[in-house]
Amino acid sequence: MFTYAGNIHIHSLYSDGSGTIEEIAASAAAAGLSYIIITDHDTLDGLPEEGIRHGVVVLVGAELNRESHHYLALNLEQLAAGNEINPQEMVDRVRQSGALGFMAHPFEKGSPYIDRGKSYPWFRFPRDGFTGLELWNYTSTWRGRVTSVLRAVYWFFFNRKAAVDGPPREALALWDSYTSR
């Protein structure tokens, strides 16, 4: 049996990330990952950089941003438009294009101490048509647990692992509800 470890939700300099795809791939190799999927916000600019870099499979998709939900799409030829209110329409459009789609950070809570509390949870879940869901978005979970500036500073600079102990239970329960159908 083969086990492949990777990350399906990474941003580069093409949106709000801080590294080039080359730098991200080198870091992924150092961390022992087999693959990464670059999903910059509403852009496919990284597509020419797909391939194998530093022994890591690098794929490029997009995070389709809407106020009521964010959706990771892979194998898109162009960005999919979607209704702001109806996530099912977004899921259907991505699927009809032949792409794979994943619900991103479905239970994101945010913190008033970080980015003025902005978060992008899903308020309505699709019936079907998606490939999967992001069970654990470390950054979203971390931000949701920041309840003071002091705590944020301590966790960020001295003990990043203290705030996060695993995927949110509600995400696991949602996945279980879909897979038990």
Where are these regions (language model features)?
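A metal-dependent hydrolase metal-coordination microenvironment
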Residues: 1-181
